[in-house]
Amino acid sequence: MKNKSDDYVIRVLNSPQAIDAVQWNKLLALQEPASELNPFMRHEYLAAMQASGSAVPNTGWTPHFIALYNGTELVGVCALYLKSHSYGEYVFDWAWANAYQQHGLAYYPKALVASPFTPAPGPRLLAKDAATRVQLVKALMAWCDSEKLSSLHVLFGSDADIAACAEAGLMLRHTVQFHWKNVVPTLVAARTALPPEGAVLARGGPSLQTAAPTPVAARTAQPPTQTQFKDFEDFLGSLNQEKRKKIRQERRKVSEAGVVFRAIRGADMSSADWDFFYRCYERTYIEHGNAPYLSRNFFELMATQMPENWLMFVAEREDRPIACSLIALSSGEQNGQKTAYGRYWGALERVDCLHFEACYYQPLQWCIAHGFDSFEGGAQGEHKMARALLPVKTTSAHWLAHPSFADAVERFLAREEEGIAGYMEALERRNPFKPTAS
């Protein structure tokens, strides 16, 4: 499908392979923060989702990528999927779907702009500038309207994405994640790190002028004068006594069980390493009665096309691998933020506190040793606060075609935002760090 919007040609494509990878990644590199290339929006990552059979029509993800061209130049693009369910999204709208069904209306298929199965904040609407990003949102909404879809959802977007969605009249919704920063936070810094409350936007109108998206700097960012931790002991020394003692106890349990760890960068991972990881990854899903979202072939593609973006921790006991965690790493590490993302984990044997060691303590220790600025722990999990991951808000944007349901969801989001504000305040009182002067 082709049409025109202002000076741009809009193409709707059923595969990322139909878009030049060099142009895509060049556009991704322009997004904020410019010094950090988000791995989950790389062309290779999204192409692997489809090529591996992980995010395809048979699994409920039908690709319809929206691309804006100025001549032959790609100036805007997003990964749009028609969804026949709400699995693998981590922003829960099952209640909305049920309400539609109860009133005899179809909620699915819906339009979703996201990186499949990936609840990591970052750019979703890639554009050469703010004006083009607004045009991209308009193209999205026009396409949804032409296809008579129930709704459009932009998940875990960047500040620039959210601003463009707000300008177009989409409603904003917040969720809470837990992220770690490689600096000693002051109580004042931790408080100001919380994004502004009451930022639910009306669908158009003057209220858009008073609501602000969550700033990137607000994601527990720290003053630039602060330095990184010297080592893991330095990090532990910043925690209050209770949390410091608990972490040491948990690490001791794993060590006394005879478990040791190997950290392996992507380029050094063998096929056997990836096979073992997948056994662990698959086991986690099976234990919860589910099939894994991602196929073994997806990780094979990651191993060959994006090895620099992966880090594996293998737990061994008596020279046998027993558990594994896989961490994603941002690209563009030379001039700015370097971020690690906790992604997958699994174990073939049970050891007390092994999950905490594999998924938090080993990655944090590695981040400190390698000068990484932050570690994002993924969706949900307030137990992460005891491991020094602090709460931050993430933002998604939503448009519903049905006026009455849109009004109802808007009221729901306003109530939900009040609850999140109270939740954030309660979490702040559980700050695991020592009180320090600002």
Residue ranges and their predicted role:
Residues 1-203, 208-438:
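N-acyltransferase acceptor-side catalytic subdomain
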